[in-house]
UniProtKB/Swiss-Prot annotation:
Species: Saccharomyces cerevisiae (strain ATCC 204508 / S288c) (Baker's yeast)
Official protein name in the record: Small ribosomal subunit protein mS37
GO CC term (a single one): mitochondrial inner membrane
Residue stretches making up the CHCH domain: 27-69
Keyword Disulfide bond in record: yes
Length: 95
């Protein structure tokens, strides 16, 4: 018997894959603008000149999103890196 502790390895898998990677999503810009506009209207009254800037920003934001100019959904790259580094994680035997 040798004094070495046993080496624990991952079970043999065809590939290492994360099923549902978590991706951070940014807040919808149009939703934030609409909230600010409604708050402005509740403070200063409907169609107040102080809120005119928010109205134009909200209109431009909604027209851009209607035309499809919004950002594409960002895909997670965790599975790419897991596949790339699987041999290092698994620890192939050196014998």
């Amino acid at each position: 018997m040798s004094g070495k502790p046993p080496v624990y390895r991952l079970p043999p898998l065809p590939r290492l894959k994360v099923k549902k990677p978590i991706i951070r999503q940014e807040a919808n810009k149009c939703l934030v603008l609409m909230s600010n506009l409604l708050q402005c209207w509740s403070s200063y009254g409907h169609m107040s000149p102080k809120c005119a800037g928010l109205v134009t920003e909200l209109k431009s934001c909604t027209s851009e999103s209607a035309l499809g100019k919004r950002n594409n959904v960002q895909k997670s790259n965790i599975n790419y890196h897991a596949a790339r580094l699987y041999d290092r994680i698994n620890g192939k035997p050196h014998d």
